[in-house]
UniProtKB/Swiss-Prot annotation:
The keyword Cytoplasm applies. It is an enzyme of class 2 (transferase). GO terms for biological process: tRNA wobble position uridine thiolation. The gene is tusE. Its EC number is 2.8.1.-. The active site is at 108 (cysteine persulfide intermediate). It comes from Haemophilus influenzae (strain ATCC 51907 / DSM 11121 / KW20 / Rd). One of its GO terms (molecular function) is sulfur carrier activity. Could be part of a sulfur-relay system. Belongs to the DsrC/TusE family. Keywords: Cytoplasm, Transferase. It comes from the Bacteria. This is Sulfurtransferase TusE homolog.
């Protein structure tokens, strides 16, 4: 359970929102604080990219899918594992989808 601006938001045991429609930027900030991530414009770009990906494909991207899709849309400098790992050190697909308020990617342990 997360308290965001006085509103209780349900999460699973790993901290992913149970109801993605409860996501907003304040939720992302609260989750980022728990994950020890200071959000920058680069983080927001990935968070919104992941949310758009989910809207289009109805699935949270695993790391390979995320890297490939980002490289196609944002270029090789942002669509690579090193760049994403720098932003999300506990696992780009795992942390980016968590901050985006989406379900945990199926291939994340």
């Amino acid at each position: 359970m997360l308290n965001i601006n006085g509103i209780e938001v349900e999460t699973d045991k790993d901290g992913y929102l149970l109801h993605s429609q409860q996501w907003n930027e304040d939720a992302a900030r609260a989750i980022a604080q728990l994950e020890s991530i200071e959000l920058t414009d680069a983080h927001w770009e990935v968070i919104y990219f992941v949310r758009d990906f989910y809207q289009e494909y109805n699935t949270s991207p695993a790391i390979r899918m995320l890297v490939k899709a980002m490289a196609e849309k944002l270029g090789a400098d942002k669509g690579n594992s090193r760049y994403l790992q720098h932003l999300f050190p506990e696992g780009p697909a795992k942390q980016a989808t968590k901050l985006a308020g989406l379900p945990k990617p199926a291939k994340c342990l």
